[in-house]
Every structure is written in C-alpha cells, then in structure tokens.
Amino acid sequence: MAVTLDKEAYYRRIKRFFGSWKKGDDEFANVDAIVVSVGVDEEIVYAKSTALQTWLFGYELTDTIMVFCEEKILFMASKKKVEFLKQIANTKGNENANGTPAITLLVREKQNESNKGNFDKMIEAIKVSKKGKRIGVFIKDKFPGDFMKSWYDILNKESFEKVDISASVAYTIAVKEEGELNLMKKAASITSDVFSKFFKDRVMEIVDADEKVRHGKLAESVEKAIEDKKYLGGTDPSTIEMCYPPIIQSGGNYNLKFSVVSDKNHMHFGAITCALGIRYKSYCSNLVRTLMVDPTQEMQENYNFLLQLQEELLKELKHGAKICDAYQVIMDQVKKQKPDLMSKITKTLGFAMGIEFREGSLVINNKNQYKLKKGMVFSVHLGLAELNNKMGKKPEEKTYALFVGDTVLVNEEGAATVLTNVKKKVKNVGIFLKKEDEEEEEEEKDEAEDLLGRGSRAAALLTERTRNEMTAEEKRRTHQKELATQLNDEAKRRLTEQKGGQQTMKARKSNVSYKNASQVPKEPELREMKLYIDKKYETVIMPVFGISTPFHIATIKNISMSVEGDYTYLRINFFCPGSALGRNEGNIFPNPEATFVKEITYRASNVKTPGDPSVPSLNLQNAFRIIKEVQKRYKTREAEEKEKEGIVKQDSLVINLNRSNPKLKDLYIRPNIAQKRMQGSLEAHVNGFRFTSVRGDKVDILYNNIKHALFQPCDGEMIIVLHFHLKNAIMFGKKRHTDVQFYTEVGEITTDLGKHQHMHDRDDLYAEQLEREMRHKLKTAFKNFIEKVESLTKEDLEFEIPFRDLGFNGAPYRSTCLLQPTSSSLVNTTEWPPFVVTLDEVELVHFERVQFHLKNFDMVIVYKEYGKKVTMINAIPMASLDPIKEWLNSCDIKYTEGVQSLNWTKIMKTIVDDPEGFFEQGGWSFLEPDGEGSDAAEGDSESELDDETFNPSEDEEEEEEDSDEDYSDETEDSVDSEESADSEEESGKDWDELEEEARKADRESLYEEVEEQKSGNRKRKGHAPLPNPSKKRKK
C-alpha cells in the first residue's frame, strides 16, 4: 500500500514544536535556527534526530537534513523522500494555512559536489532567521557517510554558535497524544504477554526439570518468542522488535542497569531477575521482574518493601510535580524505615520513554528539576543490589538482588497508571518447593500423598499455570471494560461532529418530455385522438378529455392489455404519492402536492367497420408493444446510470514499456468480465495492475485505489488467490465492483466417483505427486510476483497473508466458509462472493445465541458508520468463541454477548435517529450481560452464567415466561431463515416433531416402559420453553 503521512498529526506536532521554541525560557528559546541531520548508521538504534523524525512523520528518513527557521522549514532528501514529504508541503498561495511555516523541499543529488547549491540555500536561510548566529543541534548525534561529512564541513566553516537542545526537545515530545498512548499500551501488553506466557512458564519448567540453562541461551529464546504469533495475540510480527536484548541474571552476579548483556553462566535457582522491553511501531515499553525460588523470610520482607516503595513512587508521579521531589520522597521513606538499604537501592528510579527507550534528560533522580505532565510515560524501576543472604551456603547463594519495574502513565490527578499489568506479589513471583523431610512427614500422615513423591514441583507448576490462565481472563475482562468506556466516548464525540452535516434526501428525478411546444410531434395520430409513442423523447402521448397529453415513460408504473368480447382494453398505471414503489424507484416526488393521475384505461373495438383501413384496436396493441420496448430500454439505461453513481474517476494507467514487468499468466478473474469465464494475464505497471483476457478485455486497478491487497496461498485450498479490496468501486461488465480477485485452480475441483480406486494405484500416486509439485510451483510463482510488485512500488503496496491458525468457520452468506484474520481485516477470499471486513471500521462485535446447549452461535459486526448495515456471520462453532474473543481483545475491539437474536435494523435506526438520547441512556452498555436495557431480562432468565439460585418475583416470572415463549417461537421460525441454514442440529425441528419420532422409535423397539415414561413427560412438557442451561449444569 502507498506510504501515507498523517498530515493532521504532523500539523499538531510541528505547532507544538515551534510553540516550545518561541515560548520557552531556556537555551532552546534563544537559538535562531534548528538543524537536524540524519545519516545512515545501522549501529545507532536510538537518537534524538531519528526520534524527532518519527514523531513528526511516522517514519525514519535517512540521509535527510532538516532546517527549522523562524519563518520557514527546509527539508533536503532524496527524490523518493521528497515525494513523500510533498504530502505536507504548502502549496503556493497557501503558506501558513495550517498555522505552520512554509516548507521548501530540496532534492539531494547522488554526487556530493552537486549538493553545494542546496547547502548554500540552507546556510542562507539560517543566516536570515532571527539573528542568524546561534543554531540548535543534537550534540551527541553524529552520523557517518560522505553526504553527512560534506554537510558538517560546510556548517563548521560558518561561525555559528552551536547549542545542544536535546533536553528541551525531549521535554516537548515527552507528552504523548492519544494515538501514541495506544501504541505504548499495545507494546506494554505484548511485553506482559511474552513475560507471562513464555518466560515465566519456561523458568518454571527449568526449575521443575532441574535443567541447566545458560542466561544467554534463555535470553535468545525470549527474543525468538516475539516471532511466534501465539504470544503476540494476532499482532503483525514485522511491527515488533526488542528495545534491547533481554537481561537475565542470577547466582550472585547482578548489575541492575539496562546497558548490560546476559552472561553465559548457568541460571541459579535463587533470585532470578529479568528485564524485558518490546517496541511496537517505534514506541517502547519495559518490564522488570524478579522470580524467587524458595525465598527466605528476609528476602520476602525486602521484596515487599520494594513493592511498597514502588507504590509510593506511583502516587508521587502526577501532573505538576517535580521529578526530584518524587525521588526525595522515596529516599526519605527508605531512610526512615530501612536505613541499612540506603546504600543498596538503585541510584535512579526510572526514566521517561517513548520513541527512545531511555530519555537521559528525564531521569528520576535528585537533580532533575523538570515538572511532570499528564501523558508522559515512564519506566519506573526500583532495585536493591548486593543484599546478603544469611542462610546461603554456596557462593552464588550468599548474594542476591531484587529488581521490579513497570511502564507507567502519568495522570492529571491520582497515582500513575501501570500499563504492564503483570502480577508481582510474592505469591505470584515466588516458586515454593517442598523439602525432602516435609515430603517424608506427609508420607507418614497420609499414604495417598505418597503418589506425589518428589513431583511436588509439578504440582507447583500446575498451580502457577492455572493462576496465569485466570489472570489472562481477568486481564481480558479489564481491557474490555476500558474499551467499553472508550467506545462510548469516541462514538459520542464522532456523532457530535457529524451532527452539523444534514443528510439530503434524494428526490425522484423529474423527467420533462418537452421543454417547449415546438418539440411536440405533429403526427396524424394526435389529430385522430390515438395513442402515440415518441421514441426519441421516450414519451407516451395519450388523449385525455380530448387533449393530447404527453407522459414521460418514467411516470408509467406498468401496463396491461386484455381482450373482452369485441373490445380490447389497455390499462396504464402511473406512479403517484401513496402508491407502493419498488425498492429502487425512490419515494419522494418533486412536487407531491400536485394532482396526479393514478390510472387510465382505453377501450377500442375489435370489429372492423366498413371503410376503416384496419381494426381500431390495432392502435392499442401497437402502443402496448412499443411502450414495453421503450420502458425496457429506459430501465436498462437507468440501471446502468445508477451503477455509475458515486464512481470516483480514476487516473489513467501509466504503462511500463519494460518487458521485465512482473507478470502472472493463466489467471481467471472474479467477477467475470463476460458470462463465460476466461483466462488472462495480470501485469504490474508504473501506477497499477492491468488484467488482459484472451479476448482482449482489459481491467485496470490502480495502486492508490487498493485498500487491502490479499494473498491467499493454496495450503488447504483448491485455488490460489490474489484479492484486491478497493477504496472506490470500479466499473467493468456494466457493473460496479469493490472486490476483484485473480486466481488459478491448483488441483481437480471435481472427483470422479465412478472411478475404481486402489490404495497403491500408481496413477493416483503419480497424480498426487504432480499436484504437490504444482502447488509448490504456483506458490513460488505468486510469491515472486508479490515480491517484485512490492519492490516496484517501493513497498507502497504491501500484500497481507491471512493467519490460518486464527481462522474459524462461519456463514457470512448462504454457505459456511473459513474466515481468517489478517493484520488489518477479517477475510474469506476462496468463496464467492468474498468477505472482507476492515478492522479499523469496526465499532464493536456482538455474539448472539451464546447458550449452554447450542453448538453454534452468531456474530454481528457493527461499524463506526452507523448508517451502514451490520454484518452477520452465522453458525460459528461454539469452540471458536474463546479464540475469537482473544483475537478481538488483542485488536482493541470491544465485544459483547447475549442469548437472543436482536433486531439490528431497528436498533441502528433508533441510534441514528437520536444519538444523544442513546448515549445518555448508557450507549452500548445495554449489550452487556449486567447492563440495563433489552438484555436485562435475558440476564434474569436463560443467560444466567453463574450457579447461584435465583428467586424471581411474580412480575419477573411473568416476564421470564414471555421472553422464553418469544425465544421458543423465534427458534422454531429460524428453520426457514437463512441465518440458521447450517444449524439444523439445534433448530431443525420443533419439540412436537422430535417427540413424535421418539414415540415411533420406542414403539418399534417395544420399549413399553420407556414409552410410558416419555408420554408422561410429553404431557408434563407441552410447549415449554427451552431448558435452562444453569439447571443442566447442576445435575
């Protein structure tokens, strides 16, 4: 996909940047211009220059010089980067339109000698900015390379005074916007998951099996874990990287800094410190924990004291407080409660983080005078080093360290919010193993416990794993609660902003037959008071009260002709207010107050009178035939025009005459260009694809019109697909299409059932071998094509591959198919019509018919654009419910569930009609099981999730019976609906039919006792509602 720049974010941030420069009272405010140079150096991971670029543009631009002057900004970069920066460049006559200085773009030449002219332009701009003497730079950022050297040489020749503005810029960008906070929360969530689901479990396995594992090897395995999708919750692995190599220490050798590297010593089963930081889309997070194996009482007390200090520090980190003051509060507490630990505690208690992992100017120590601001994110970590273990016997047991840290968010009031929600109490990080003497005592007390033996470690492991699973569920629920609040707030704000735009009702097109009398035909039929059809102006002229009156063909609803005796009758019905209109006819007339003709009937004789050249009724017969023809032609044209409505005109395809263009042959296209499918070739050009069929038909798809480019491999499928979901529909085959795909068949779609087969038939084995080779060949060809296209487009277009492991079965249309998530969508491209849902457009997901006794449930997708029809996915297996919830939670999508099917058309109409009233009543909270609204009755009846006894009042019982009856009727009616096409096991037959079949089967089997019992049950049951799942659970 095209690399786009978030212009709104750029304008907001550049205003803040210039605002800090002009209003500041430090060295930053006294500089005359700011120079930021970024070269190419793979060894530099974090730098102020690259951080500023990422903050402004969302990307790192190497070999780029930025000069910020008082009245203008100059960017010098390669031609490709200049094209990218043009998105924010001010056009002529539109300077300062966004309150930001005008931008001048300079193209860097490959030959350094050719860049001198551009260098001179930037030097001249610096000299005329304010006093032109002092320039702000990042002193520590020095990049190698010829281009950077040439620039530094020219800059150093001038007599500019250089001022380091690193701290001031860091303080400016330290306050995170909402979008940045979401990225940091996601990074913290991934860090927490990798620690909880991988590292902690791995350490417990090592302890349980008494393995010998080196710190370095364990750190490498943690780094590899971020490539495994099961630890990332559906996040694209390409957007994730380590902030630093994981640091694992134990056995008396501890250095509580983030610049150290895990050593090659074996892990010792004592105090095991782990520091882990993960970066998501350039934003960092950090987590530090200490796992303790059989900790002594003193070790536990010191650890609890460390947690107490951290809690106290979080309370001090609030808007407006000085960093040094927060530090001093902690030091005073240590001095007061445990003065012996003053020399053991770490010198700094944390630092600010964001695009850079460690912000050196915002460290929590006793010298930092900066004030905290709401929206800042800190890594708060406290450690106690070189602690003595009095009970230690071996050298590695005598010294230990404790280290705890989290990523936290500074709030306006109250304590800072922890973003890395990994439990850290002693019971959560302690691994307690039973001693041999304790096991012997238990054997004497109870012989049954002898079966455990020395496997107590496994029992401890199981307990910890169970606790972790519970923690994951609690974490998911907590996250969903946060999303619910955020959902209502954002939806309310969005609808308020849209309130100003009034929707214009589309009026029915007014068709005027003749603009003046001169256009009316002078045919003899008009003088003879006969019906006349003017094909040119698509008008029927008919006599009304002796006057020839024109009616446009669009006003005629339908016509009918009948012969009764000696007469022929022609009846013409017209469209008029109050009449039933077709779905596509529109129901608003230009002038509804006017007088309308509803119908006209003409009669003509079938008897030929002497002297007449023809039968009088011939005029009506001809009129009937010609009106039908004109009406058909008019409706066809109108349908084509309607298809073209809203079609955005695309740019012309720029053909690349180079014969080495990426090309795939022997592909089919869906939807078909003609009635019969035809093969063709797909070729990538300068700005788009062109598909050419063997007949010569052409379909062009531009890169900038592609919303999702999907590649569906042939693994487990009979076809291999390239699918394009478009931003704006395109026209071909006289219809508009937003989904176009190109595919080829891999194996035989059909199987000859009459063929005699044998297990070791050579032909079959050979055919299977050929199919395997064909699959491999096709997959390789498609992957090569994709790589070439991405290279050709400079990665402006990127193909997404569905995650088959996260897929689930469902029926979005009439048949069941495999729905698979990608990094930005939920898709099925192998069946037609295809199914593509963009996750960014989803407001929330609601699960319907989630009941204990049903095997399937339905999924409703509600979009942020409330006027858009909701998407239903039916008949999803109940086993897929938890994985879907986990995936949605990882994508920050709110989900709810209920036992009944809701009328979504009515719900969405209610919301659109009165959005303010909807959100005043709680918004989407009515979908929650414990929410108020339509689901409250469900929560009191069949959807009771816990096993507590419920004693309703009389009114509630009546309501419950009513709701059960409604649901029972709904279940019976669902047999004929499309939504339950694949769930015949639950709602295929009603209770009476099932009981009748059971009675017949029992009679045939001569089970008289069972027959009597079932007949008794039938008398007692009648038309009872479906059984309560909670009662079934209690049996």
UniProtKB/Swiss-Prot annotation:
<dbReference type="InterPro" id="IPR036005">
    <property type="entry name" value="Creatinase/aminopeptidase-like"/>
</dbReference>
<keyword id="KW-0804">Transcription</keyword>
<dbReference type="InterPro" id="IPR000994">
    <property type="entry name" value="Pept_M24"/>
</dbReference>
<comment type="subunit">
    <text>Component of the FACT complex (also called the DUF complex), a stable heterodimer of ssrp1 and supt16h. May also be a component of a ck2-spt16-ssrp1 complex composed of ssrp1, supt16h, csnk2a1, csnk2a2 and csnk2b. The FACT complex may also interact with vcp.</text>
</comment>
<keyword id="KW-0158">Chromosome</keyword>
<dbReference type="Pfam" id="PF21091">
    <property type="entry name" value="SPT16_C"/>
</dbReference>
<dbReference type="InterPro" id="IPR033825">
    <property type="entry name" value="Spt16_M24"/>
</dbReference>
<dbReference type="InterPro" id="IPR040258">
    <property type="entry name" value="Spt16"/>
</dbReference>
<dbReference type="Pfam" id="PF08644">
    <property type="entry name" value="SPT16"/>
</dbReference>
<dbReference type="GO" id="GO:0006368">
    <property type="term" value="P:transcription elongation by RNA polymerase II"/>
</dbReference>
<keyword id="KW-0805">Transcription regulation</keyword>
<keyword id="KW-0235">DNA replication</keyword>
<keyword id="KW-0539">Nucleus</keyword>
<comment type="function">
    <text>Component of the FACT complex, a general chromatin factor that acts to reorganize nucleosomes. The FACT complex is involved in multiple processes that require DNA as a template such as mRNA elongation, DNA replication and DNA repair. During transcription elongation the FACT complex acts as a histone chaperone that both destabilizes and restores nucleosomal structure.</text>
</comment>
<dbReference type="GO" id="GO:0006260">
    <property type="term" value="P:DNA replication"/>
</dbReference>
<dbReference type="InterPro" id="IPR048969">
    <property type="entry name" value="FACT_SPT16_C"/>
</dbReference>
<dbReference type="Pfam" id="PF08512">
    <property type="entry name" value="Rttp106-like_middle"/>
</dbReference>
<dbReference type="InterPro" id="IPR029149">
    <property type="entry name" value="Creatin/AminoP/Spt16_N"/>
</dbReference>
<feature type="region of interest" description="Disordered">
    <location>
        <begin position="920"/>
        <end position="1035"/>
    </location>
</feature>
<feature type="compositionally biased region" description="Polar residues">
    <location>
        <begin position="499"/>
        <end position="519"/>
    </location>
</feature>
<dbReference type="InterPro" id="IPR013953">
    <property type="entry name" value="FACT_SPT16_M"/>
</dbReference>
<dbReference type="GO" id="GO:0006281">
    <property type="term" value="P:DNA repair"/>
</dbReference>
<dbReference type="InterPro" id="IPR011993">
    <property type="entry name" value="PH-like_dom_sf"/>
</dbReference>
<dbReference type="InterPro" id="IPR029148">
    <property type="entry name" value="FACT-SPT16_Nlobe"/>
</dbReference>
<dbReference type="InterPro" id="IPR056595">
    <property type="entry name" value="Fact-SPT16_PH"/>
</dbReference>
<dbReference type="Pfam" id="PF24824">
    <property type="entry name" value="PH_SPT16"/>
</dbReference>
<keyword id="KW-0234">DNA repair</keyword>
<feature type="compositionally biased region" description="Acidic residues">
    <location>
        <begin position="929"/>
        <end position="985"/>
    </location>
</feature>
<keyword id="KW-0175">Coiled coil</keyword>
<comment type="similarity">
    <text>Belongs to the peptidase M24 family. SPT16 subfamily.</text>
</comment>
<dbReference type="Pfam" id="PF14826">
    <property type="entry name" value="FACT-Spt16_Nlob"/>
</dbReference>
<feature type="coiled-coil region">
    <location>
        <begin position="432"/>
        <end position="500"/>
    </location>
</feature>
<dbReference type="InterPro" id="IPR013719">
    <property type="entry name" value="RTT106/SPT16-like_middle_dom"/>
</dbReference>
<feature type="region of interest" description="Disordered">
    <location>
        <begin position="491"/>
        <end position="520"/>
    </location>
</feature>
<keyword id="KW-0227">DNA damage</keyword>
<feature type="compositionally biased region" description="Basic and acidic residues">
    <location>
        <begin position="986"/>
        <end position="1006"/>
    </location>
</feature>
<dbReference type="Pfam" id="PF00557">
    <property type="entry name" value="Peptidase_M24"/>
</dbReference>
<dbReference type="GO" id="GO:0035101">
    <property type="term" value="C:FACT complex"/>
</dbReference>
<protein>
    <recommendedName>
        <fullName>FACT complex subunit SPT16</fullName>
    </recommendedName>
</protein>
<dbReference type="GO" id="GO:0031491">
    <property type="term" value="F:nucleosome binding"/>
</dbReference>
